[in-house]
Amino acid sequence: MKKIVSLVLAALLVLSLAACGSKDNASDGNPVWPTSALNVLETVWNTYGEDEKFAVAGGDFSEANAREDAPGVFDLKDRALADSELGLPETAEVDEAASLVHMMNANTFTAAAYHATGDTAELAQQLRDNIMQRQWMCGVPDKLIVAEVGDEYVVTVFGADELVDTFMTHLNGIYGVSAVHTAYDEAIL
């Protein structure tokens, strides 16, 4: 009887340890790749645990794109608004944008994703320079991170250290450190 119980317990242990093994994010074993700027932010936000989430709004302020508690599309027709709200230079070579912003204060957390139509490294530099030169009101964000995701997407995130770090942990966890190149990780002074 003891042998049977021991074998059953050993089998349960082996099965439970096997269940803890690594899993790919994609169901077919292939790495996950972004399909749009919005997809980047939605994929990251959807991996947050309930204890990590906070009140957010996404998209621009149009009726079609504004979203509560989720990322949203940011229409690029008004480039001055995209510059003011997200730090996207008006001359940047992008054809898609999406945003996810802390509902109480954008300086606490703002994330944006862009589909680059030009060089992602150049876009990352433009975004970094444009955001770092801002005059902040209602508090200064702690830090800025600009990351290239694959060959076509650039993500910016600025705000409180803990919120920015959590976002980057999820971004790297989804796309992998081989696909996410952190171009800039700087304190905002």
What is each model feature region?
Residues G21-T110, A116-L189:
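Soluble, non-membrane globular domain cores that form compact, hydrophobic packing
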Residues M1-I4, V8-A11:
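Positively charged n-region of N-terminal signal peptides that target proteins for export
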Residues L15-A19:
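C-terminal motif of bacterial Sec signal peptides marking the signal peptidase cleavage site
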